[in-house]
Design a protein with these regions (language model features):
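Secreted, luminal/periplasmic, and some membrane-associated catalytic domains
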Residues: 34, 70, 77-79, 101-110, ...
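Non-catalytic, well-ordered alpha-helical segments in soluble enzyme domains
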Residues: 48, 60-61, 140-143, 314-350, ...
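Bacterial Sec-dependent N-terminal signal peptides
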Residues: 1-31
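His/Asp/Glu-rich, glycine-adjacent segments
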Residues: 92, 98-240, 335-338, 511-512
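Short, structured active-site-proximal loop/turn typified by the sulfatase FGly-forming signature C/S-X-P-X-R
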Residues: 51-98, 102, 148-151
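Substrate-binding rim/cap in mid-to-C-terminal beta-strand-loop elements of soluble/periplasmic
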Residues: 297-333, 399-440, 444-445, 465
């Protein structure tokens, strides 16, 4: 009897093993989602209206089958380095402390803002006791879980580095920065030297995708690969939105995206790769002539370009010793100027949406109130709906040909598309989402804890495996105004609210004579 029992038990176990091999999910093997890899793909400066069958056929076709975020947000200020740090940390600048493409750290330079190249960021890191960002990043969380992240970027060294600033067991591959240093010779040997800029500079995009195909898109590759192509941003800055050069750049980066999709298909990896598509910001046409530094000097509110009484870092204004009277004078002068849009200051009290200076809204309203690094004033250029010569709407009063950084819907409202084994197909999400939600969502997919300091949320509505009930968001408008002898300055800020999460949609200024 005992012999018969053990023989039967052995047969039963054999059957279970066979079934487990055929139906692994049903028999408690490692969570399937933990095996799926993720590709994050950013097209720098991608306006939603670029995604058409004519301009970007590969991305357009992808969008038809993907799930789409209909109400996705760039992080304000709508500049590249803010958004690379924000998506990487799942946090806003008020939390992670990287406040612009130009930044002010007096320990590095007392009288001027500095850039955000890798070399600049290393100076900041040294001056800040090795704490470049005051928030934990996706790369750090993955490394602590025994996983890794690789970044493939054709943009600036700073943008590439901020996506995984600790690097750890991962890597960064950029035409001007390869980390760790020990990986550099291997990349240059196997991928080849970075192409010369040439007429249009597109070679760097292909080189970066070559590296992705070699090191990222494979079964034993990193759990997360992040790609960031610096066009159409570069071409639109120089030649304008809708210019033939910008259209050509769109076509080229779309072809590179097509190469990635083809490679996933050829390698049989489409069923094990999630893909998240977005951008750092939209774009507007520029028509301005004013410069903030020159304006303050002309008004007697800053001594000269090299003085440290007032330091300008893009739209951020740092007033020496936080002198309240000088801050008020600067705000008053800005309110009168038609080229100036929204003006923000520190909160009237903790958590307040109103700024402490009359006629301003708070840094809290825009997630900008870093305890140590925020300036005293933040200024956005005024904007309108004017259409450029190529029929693209959205104009502001910054200098140059075209760009971003402001608080218009043309810069804040951006594309989001997701596809893959962990995401629903063909779902159109009307809830507000942001670039800060990307990292928490990935951590949710992989069953990793979301650090408490992260500001973003898990976009559970996109996930196949979700038990959360349907939710609704609401709109809210915050208004402030102040009267002057010349008239009234009125500032409105439109936001979407989902539970405890606030999303900045746009701001609008009226001057009433």
């Amino acid at each position: 009897m005992k012999k018969y029992f053990f023989k039967s038990l052995a047969n039963f176990c054999s059957i279970l093993v066979a079934l487990a091999l055929v139906y692994p999910d049903a028999y408690g093997q490692t969570n399937k989602s933990a095996k799926n890899k993720t590709l994050i793909f950013f097209f720098d400066g991608l306006r939603p209206d670029y995604i058409t069958a004519e301009l970007m056929p590969n991305l357009y076709a992808f969008k038809q089958k993907a799930s789409v975020g209909m109400h996705h947000h760039s992080v304000f200020p709508t500049v590249t380095r803010v958004n690379s740090a924000s998506y990487a940390t799942g946090s806003y600048p008020g939390t992670h402390g990287l406040l612009g493409n130009a930044i002010y750290f007096p320990a590095v330079n007392k009288s001027k803002a500095i850039g955000t190249t890798y070399e600049d960021l290393m100076k900041v890191q040294e001056s800040e006791s090795n704490q470049l960002l005051t928030a934990v990043s996706l790369g750090e969380v993955l490394q602590s879980a025994g996983e890794k992240m690789m970044v493939f970027s054709s943009g600036t060294t700073g943008q590439a580095f901020l996506q995984n600033h600790k690097v750890g067991n991962g890597a960064i591959v950029n035409p001007e920065l390869i980390l760790p240093e020990s990986f550099k010779s291997q990349v240059l040997t196997e991928i080849g030297d970075v192409p010369q800029k040439g007429e249009n500079g597109y070679g760097k995009h292909k080189w970066v995708i070559d590296a992705l195909l070699k090191y990222g898109l494979k079964n034993d590759g990193p759990l997360v690969s992040a790609v960031w192509l610096s066009d159409p941003d570069g071409s639109a800055h120089r030649y304008g939105i809708g210019s033939k050069q910008a259209i050509s750049a769109l076509a080229f980066v779309d072809q590179q995206f097509g190469r990635v999709l083809d490679s996933l298909q050829t390698r049989g990896l489409t069923t094990v790769f999630n893909i998240i598509i977005s951008t750092d910001h939209g774009f507007v046409t520029h028509t301005g002539k004013q410069n903030l530094t020159d304006f303050l000097i002309s008004q007697g509110l800053k001594k000269d370009k090299d003085s440290d009484d007032v330091v300008i870092a893009e739209g951020a204004v740092y007033v020496k010793d936080h002198n309240a009277e000088n801050i008020k004078k600067i705000v008053s002068a800005l309110h009168k100027e038609n080229w100036v849009g929204a003006v923000f200051t520190k909160p009237k009290k903790k958590g307040s949406m109103q700024g402490w200076v009359y006629g301003t809204l708070s840094f809290e309203a825009i997630h900008y109130n870093h305890p140590r690094r925020s300036g005293d004033i933040l200024v956005a250029p005024n904007w309108n709906d004017e259409i450029n010569d190529k029929e693209y709407p959205g104009t502001d009063f910054s200098r140059g040909v075209a760009g971003h950084g402001g608080s218009s819907p043309y810069e804040i409202n951006i594309a989001l598309m997701v596809s893959g084994p962990d995401f629903k197909s063909g779902y159109h999400d009307t809830l507000p989402t942001s670039n800060v939600d990307i990292t928490p969502t990935l951590l949710g997919i992989y069953g990793l804890p979301v650090p408490t300091q992260m500001d973003g949320r898990i976009m559970s509505e996109f996930l196949k495996k979700t038990s959360e009930p349907a939710r609704k968001s609401r709109k809210e408008t915050i208004v402030t105004e102040v009267k002057y002898p010349w008239g009234t300055y009125k500032l409105s800020l439109d936001m979407s609210i989902l539970d405890q999460y606030r999303y900045f949609n746009f701001s609008k200024v009226e001057r009433i004579q």
